[in-house]
Each structure stands twice: as C-alpha cells, then as structure tokens.
Amino acid sequence: MDTPLTEGYWWNKTWFSLTCGPRVPLNKANVQHCLHDTNIYLTGDSTTRQWFAAITEALGLGQPEDHERVFLLQRREKTANLNLTFIFHPLTAHPQNIFVNLSTVKFEADVILDLPRHTCRNVVVFSPWAHFCFWQWEAYTDWLKGIRAAILVAMQRCPDLLFVYKSPHPRDEWSAFHARDIVFNEMRALVRDVFKGLGLIFVDIWDMNLGSPWPIALHMPKDVINQEVSVLLSYLCPLLQSRDKIKTTV
C-alpha cells in the first residue's frame, strides 16, 4: 500500500489515522481487555514516561510523578493481571546536571534480554531520540543495532514477543535539546532501515503532533498523548486478541 501524504487528521480533539484503523480509544475497559496478563515495558525518555502516565491514569492507578528525576516507575493492575514498567534509558545527554542512580536505569537491550521467560506475553516499547541529538550518527546507529541484536536473541526464545518503536515528533525551537527537527525526522528513517524485516510495530506520531491544534512542544498536552496511546492500542489489541483466540481453540 502506498504511504499517504499525511498519516491522518485532527477533528474535535481526536486524531483520525489514515494508516491504522479501526481505532481503540484509551479507557480502562479497553486497556484491561486488550492487555490482560501482559507485561508492558516502556523504555525511553520523559516523552515515553508520558505514555506510562496516560495508561496508569486510564486504569485508575493514579497519576505518577512526571519530572526529570523519575527514572523507574512500576504499576500493577490486579484485575487484569497487567504489569507496567517505565525505565529511563541511561548514558544520554540531559539538559540539567542531576544525579542518576544507575541501578534504576537499563539499556533497552538489557531490558529485552532480561524479559521474563515464563511467559511470552511481553511488550517492549522503545523510543531513543530526544536525548540523542548530540550523538554522532554512527554512535546512534550502533545503539539501534544493539537493540536489534537483542530483539533477534529474544525472538529466538519466544517469537510471539511484541516490540514497539515510538517515533520522534517535532518540538519547539526553544527546547533544551538544540537540534533541528530534520535531525529527529532522519532518526525515523534510520529506525525503519535498521529494524526492517523484524515485524516491529512502528507508532509514527510525527504528523499527529505536527498537525495538532496545540502549540508544538517537547512534552505535548494530555489530549495529544492520549491519542498517541490510542494508536498504540490499535496495534496491540488485534494482535493480542488473535493470540487469545488461538489459545482457546487449541
């Protein structure tokens, strides 16, 4: 299928995707129904932490602290047997001088290689972008290739694992990360090339953010984040539900 000129459009504070449908709204019932008995690992920066916050809030698990000093967050939804973990990626540039306890952070590759082996119902979201604008291109490529190598090892043990890449998005020019949007846009293309053929779920939020009725910022408002997570659910729910049906028919 040809890639459309735009990924979708906004109407009444809702993003309508032209590449992913039907949509699964972000709410407690949908999260419990789709992601039951699942371990969700969200790795990345504070923009990925916003996804964690949106999901936990939808589940009624409270709004976690969302500031620059939170590097590890965990929540459990007992009714659906759903475990959520956010892990900040280490060794990246940060706009402020802060102390980081290295025991609370993990490389994406280590998160993948340390996945529980008693179940294949694991989802890993990774999104290395905002803090990597200062990196040499070769070094950033090596970082991605390390993640790819870990995915290949993990999928040999369990082919049903699901891996999700959350793309960069445009941000305001006055952001603490002094890089042009073209750098982050090129990261999107590089990720598609590095992970080609792995069946990776690519949640592309570039056009959604660029076309939103709110001002562009590194940390977009809750309405945008909720629509981003809705797109994530629209990918995950059909895949996980189809596997549930296979289990019930065996």
PLM region descriptions:
Residues 1-250:
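A compositional signature for long Ser/Thr(±Pro)-rich, low-complexity
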